[in-house]
């Protein structure tokens, strides 16, 4: 049973029981809608950064209002991601886009970069909103509703530097010890993640290369239309034909541009998001292993140093519960993530295949129409030449 769906509130009457039944075919009623838009650039003497408007509309009772509007910068999104990982170490947190991918600082905040990031941040928040557990996280609610000064104040309430350093040291120590007896199902999960990471990174590189080649092809093809127009000015007998060729090239250029837009907006972001997911999954597995390694070390101490371990059995019991909760959370989220991944990848490639079919049909029809017109023209000229 999924513990997240269990409610301790028992129905008090047959009618209330019927009202609480949820049929599998019944669609989920979405009650949280988030939009990320209107990026704004801010320049100070210290730094330059972008903030994004976040509009939240909800019918949930735990929110003080039905609509909220706040502005957040990338650092705030990083904070939220960190808090979610801290609260749910073995849940699969959606990935954030990289801080920046640039060749030079001049390109850092160009329009394409800002729009690409805006879309990624929008997807990040909506994936959290759609998650059965993360959507009810208190830090997520504060992120969506608190004004800037309130969020800043809330951030300061977290663990201090020394506490965070202590957690890091313990995590490193656990990872150094490693896990001696990782359960078989998590061995299989780890193998899947490694193989998935290799394949999705390869697909990402190939997709980027295809887009680059498409861009080069498009840039070169754009030059041929004007060339044929200029050529027609010096060929009196071929004026109409050359202009028709230029028109066909122009239509094919527009079709190519549309296909490139589909590639850059539909396929590339999905593939790259799952590249980032593969990195997130490796982090989740490490955190699960750290929890188990902590339990293993306590059991080892109890086994070899029984004289000085009066409190160890109680600690071990708590750690066993912690490991069980971590494992169950990961297993449930793993199946959910795999289903979403398969649906997303399938939809992206299916849409791209349909886009390609439409593109080639459009270009083929353009040139077939041109050839038909030229054939008819030659037939007319031939009939006119007959005595």
Swiss-Prot record:
GO molecular-function term, one example from the UniProt record: phosphatidylinositol binding
Domain BAR: 178-387
Topology of this chain in the membrane: Peripheral membrane protein
A cellular component term, taken from the record's GO annotations: early endosome
InterPro entries: AH/BAR_dom_sf, BAR_SNX7, PX_dom, PX_dom_sf, PX_SNX7
Record keywords, A-Z: Endosome, Lipid-binding, Membrane, Protein transport, Transport
Residue ranges occupied by any PX domain in the UniProt entry: 30-151
Gene3D superfamilies assigned: Arfaptin homology (AH) domain/BAR domain (1.20.1270.60), Phox-like domain (3.30.1520.10)
Localization, UniProt: Early endosome membrane
Protein residues bound to a 1,2-diacyl-sn-glycero-3-phospho-(1D-myo-inositol-3-phosphate): 73, 75, 103, 117
GO BP of this protein: endocytic recycling; mitophagy; piecemeal microautophagy of the nucleus; positive regulation of autophagosome assembly; protein transport; reticulophagy
Superkingdom of origin: Eukaryota
Role played: Involved in the regulation of endocytosis and in several stages of intracellular trafficking. Together with SNX4, involved in autophagosome assembly by regulating trafficking and recycling of phospholipid scramblase ATG9A.
Family designation: Belongs to the sorting nexin family.
Subunit structure: Heterodimer; heterodimerizes with SNX4.
Matches recorded under PANTHER family: SORTING NEXIN-4 (PTHR45949), SORTING NEXIN-7 (PTHR45949:SF3)
Protein name: Sorting nexin-7
Naturally occurring in which organism (per UniProt): Homo sapiens
């Amino acid at each position: 049973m999924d513990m997240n769906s269990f409610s301790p509130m028992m129905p008090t009457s047959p009618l209330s029981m019927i009202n609480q039944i949820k049929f599998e075919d019944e669609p989920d009623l979405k009650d949280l809608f988030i939009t990320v838009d209107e990026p704004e650039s801010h320049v100070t003497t210290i730094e330059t950064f972008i903030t994004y408007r976040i509009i939240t509309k909800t019918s949930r009772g735990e929110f003080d209002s039905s609509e909220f509007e706040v502005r957040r910068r990338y650092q705030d999104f990083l904070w939220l991601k960190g808090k979610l990982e801290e609260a749910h170490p073995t849940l699969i947190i959606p990935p954030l886009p990289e801080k920046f991918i640039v060749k030079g600082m001049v390109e850092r905040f160009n329009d394409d970069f800002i729009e690409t990031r805006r879309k990624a941040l929008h997807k990040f928040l909506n994936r959290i909103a759609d998650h059965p557990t993360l959507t009810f996280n208190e830090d997520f609610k504060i992120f969506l509703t608190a004004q800037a000064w309130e969020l800043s104040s809330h951030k300061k309430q977290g663990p201090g530097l020394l506490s965070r350093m202590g957690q890091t040291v313990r995590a490193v120590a656990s990872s150094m010890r490693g896990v001696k007896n990782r359960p078989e199902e998590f061995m299989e999960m780890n193998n899947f993640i490694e193989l998935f990471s290799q394949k999705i990174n390869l697909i990402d590189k190939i997709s980027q290369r295809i887009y680059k080649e498409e861009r080069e092809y498009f840039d070169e093809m754009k030059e041929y239309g004007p060339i044929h127009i200029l050529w027609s000015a010096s060929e009196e007998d071929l004026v109409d034909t050359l202009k028709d060729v230029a028109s066909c090239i122009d239509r094919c250029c527009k079709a190519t541009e549309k296909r490139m837009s589909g590639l850059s907006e539909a396929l590339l972001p999905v593939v790259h998001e799952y590249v980032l997911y593969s990195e997130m999954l490796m982090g989740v597995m490490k955190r699960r292993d750290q929890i188990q390694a902590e339990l293993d070390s306590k059991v080892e101490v109890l086994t070899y140093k029984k004289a000085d371990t009066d409190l160890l059995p109680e600690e071990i019991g708590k750690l066993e519960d912690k490991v069980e909760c971590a494992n169950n959370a990961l297993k449930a989220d793993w199946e959910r993530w795999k289903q979403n991944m398969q649906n997303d990848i399938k939809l992206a490639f299916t849409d791209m295949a349909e886009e390609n079919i439409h593109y080639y049909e459009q270009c083929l029809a353009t040139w077939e129409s041109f050839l038909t017109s030229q054939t008819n023209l030659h037939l007319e000229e031939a009939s006119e030449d007959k005595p």
